[in-house]
């Protein structure tokens, strides 16, 4: 990709974030095109793509036969098919799995590294972009297309925009916003996704969790009314038999080191500490605080105390911007 990622700065929590333009180099784009695109994706992901309009984007999971997620995908309609955004570390294996049955369908599934992914968030993000585009997405119309650019709107943790565009437009946006916006890399977008409670599936956690263990049902990412898709039986069983005992949590506090994806944490039990959970992602903010996204039992007490293994500092549960009550 000739468009160069911006140098990293320590990420900031959404409440204090100045206007920021980010390169999303840790995320990657992929597409499916061809006459059978919708039918093919409908048989592969947890969301009901047949009901998706041009104005919508949604989170969906692509699972194995046991209902474990290869990845989650931020899906939107693109050309005569669909495009999706996922973590770069899982794109290649996810596409390999997705292509397994494609020989029988009129589809082309491919990575897309021609287009550039940018994020805009922080103070007056909408006003800054309103000077550059004739229409911006919103709650009512979450996807807007203009020329070579697709803009996706996100409400949480605070209004922000994901821009899928060509290199020329990415350079133009950078030139126009450089004076008023801070530039940062994808760690800032990752921090916002952790705050929003959007599950982050990197390679270490691919094939490990059913969608409900990462709150996908609370994020509108699972249809329990659509026809068959890979892993559906296990995903449905988790709902209707109450088989899922896990949930995605947001922790905040201090840690002398950042836990890595796939690592466990420790839960305080009286005077002792017990290993628990699986870390999906973690970021250190500019104020020194650490935010951690972790899958744990769904019955954790809200005042529980956690720590990175053998660390002297502690982490506590923070509320997510959505409810898990069904």
UniProtKB/Swiss-Prot annotation:
Gene Ontology biological process = iron-sulfur cluster assembly; RNA modification; tRNA processing
The domain of life is: Bacteria
Q: Which GO terms describe its molecular function?
A: folic acid binding
UniProt: folate binding residues: 27, 189
Keyword field contains Transcription = no
UniProt record similarity statement: Belongs to the tRNA-modifying YgfZ family.
Function description: Folate-binding protein involved in regulating the level of ATP-DnaA and in the modification of some tRNAs. It is probably a key factor in regulatory networks that act via tRNA modification, such as initiation of chromosomal replication.
The entry's protein name is tRNA-modifying protein YgfZ
Organism expressing this protein natively: Escherichia coli (strain UTI89 / UPEC)
Gene behind this chain?
ygfZ
């Amino acid at each position: 990709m000739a468009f160069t990622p911006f140098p990293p700065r320590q990420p900031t929590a959404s409440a204090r974030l100045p206007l920021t333009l980010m390169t999303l180099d840790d995320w990657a784009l992929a597409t499916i095109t061809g006459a059978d695109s919708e039918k093919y994706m409908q048989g592969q992901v947890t969301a009901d793509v047949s009901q998706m309009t041009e104005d919508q984007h949604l989170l969906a999971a692509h699972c194995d036969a046991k209902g474990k997620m290869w990845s989650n995908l931020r899906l939107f309609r693109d050309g005569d098919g669909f495009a999706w955004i996922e973590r770069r570390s899982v794109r290649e294996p996810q596409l390999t799995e997705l292509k397994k049955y494609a020989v029988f369908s009129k589809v082309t599934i491919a990575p897309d590294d021609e287009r550039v992914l940018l994020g805009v968030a922080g103070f007056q993000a909408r006003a800054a972009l309103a000077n550059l585009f004739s229409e911006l997405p919103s709650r009512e119309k979450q996807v807007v297309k203009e020329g070579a650019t697709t803009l996706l709107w996100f409400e949480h943790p605070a209004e922000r925009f994901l821009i899928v565009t060509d290199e020329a437009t990415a350079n133009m946006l950078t030139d126009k916003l450089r004076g008023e916006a801070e530039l940062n890399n994808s760690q800032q977008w990752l921090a916002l996704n952790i705050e929003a409670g959007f599950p982050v599936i990197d390679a270490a956690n691919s094939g490990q969790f059913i969608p409900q263990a990462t709150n996908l049902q609370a994020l509108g990412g699972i249809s329990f009314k659509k026809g068959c898709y890979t892993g559906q039986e296990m995903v449905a069983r988790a709902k209707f038999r109450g088989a899922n005992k896990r949930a995605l949590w947001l922790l905040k506090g201090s840690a002398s080191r950042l836990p890595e994806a796939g690592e466990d944490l420790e839960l305080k039990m009286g005077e002792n500490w017990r290993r628990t959970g699986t870390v999906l992602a973690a970021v250190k903010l500019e104020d020194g605080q650490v935010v951690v996204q972790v899958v744990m039992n769904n019955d954790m007490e809200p005042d529980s105390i956690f720590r990175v293994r053998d660390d002297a500092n502690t982490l506590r549960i923070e509320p997510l911007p959505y409810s898990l009550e069904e």
